């Protein structure tokens, strides 16, 4: 995987949050990009031909990149999808210390923790703990702690990537 990409309502706010709160590094920004006299935006990006776009590419940890877009377009939907909606999504961050990470996020302006960290005991994910949180603009994210030796490992040779692998 090279990168994941998300459309955000305010690119400056999102870049600041990813850099200042989540520890990302800004690689570059481009924009505004627009092609008012052609159908380029629709043909290549699947958006309204009159859309304008700004983007930022971020390095997020040792092996991940994250591209953030801000579009302005006619007929643009302006609500974040829920996880249960088609196209719903969330971005998960591995943490070594769940309590410390939750306390850190609780101290960040505009961040909303959804409930409390949930330990998982049954089945393949025994040993995992997780909690969802919302960014200041409502994007769903997750903190996850998956220690080595998870229950699923006894049934397959496939191993999920862990930060310790890098």
Question: PLM features: residue spans?
Answer:
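Short glycine-enriched loop/turn motifs at secondary-structure junctions
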Residues: 83-88, 125
